[in-house]
């Protein structure tokens, strides 16, 4: 039980850690000369403030393949694919051969109906200018 802290003590310990973490100031960014010197020396791996390069790391494969991304089992088994394929084919065939209903007629009428374009009489030459219109 000596390793277990009471609730107030644990809270105080967390607060101390937070204060210690917040009091750390980030290091100043390297100046132009220092940045150029780092690039020239090639010490990028030693500087913890620079981002890691994946292409030069050991994690980067020498050659990328699809198998590495998708894994070896990228194909689904036929018993998973076939029922879905047959269900979708049956739905398309049913939609093609079914009888037309009143809902289909209404939808066709709404989609094929031509809406007359609003005629703007003020655009015709010689038409009187509307009150307050800018010319």
Curated annotation (Swiss-Prot):
Pfam families: CCSMST1. InterPro entries: UQCC4, UQCC4_vert. It comes from the Eukaryota. It is a single-pass type I membrane protein. Residues 21-58, 115-135 are annotated as: Disordered. PANTHER family: PROTEIN CCSMST1, UBIQUINOL-CYTOCHROME-C REDUCTASE COMPLEX ASSEMBLY FACTOR 4. Belongs to the UQCC4 family. Required for the assembly and stability of the mitochondrial ubiquinol-cytochrome c reductase complex (complex III or cytochrome b-c1 complex), a multisubunit transmembrane complex that is part of the mitochondrial electron transport chain (ETC) which drives oxidative phosphorylation. This is Ubiquinol-cytochrome c reductase complex assembly factor 4. The gene is UQCC4.
């Amino acid at each position: 039980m000596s390793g277990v802290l009471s609730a107030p003590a644990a809270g105080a310990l967390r607060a101390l850690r937070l204060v210690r973490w917040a009091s750390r100031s980030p290091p100043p960014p390297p100046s132009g000369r220092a940045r150029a010197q780092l690039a020239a020396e090639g010490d990028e791996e030693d500087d913890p403030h620079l981002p890691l390069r994946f292409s030069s790391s050991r994690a980067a494969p020498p050659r990328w393949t699809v198998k590495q991304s998708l894994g070896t089992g990228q194909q689904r088994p036929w018993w998973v694919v076939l029922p879905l394929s047959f269900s979708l084919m049956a739905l398309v065939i049913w939609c093609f051969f079914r009888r037309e209903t009143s809902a289909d007629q209404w939808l066709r009428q709404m989609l094929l109906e031509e809406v007359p374009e609003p005629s703007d009489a003020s655009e015709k030459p010689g038409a009187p200018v509307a009150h307050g219109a800018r010319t």
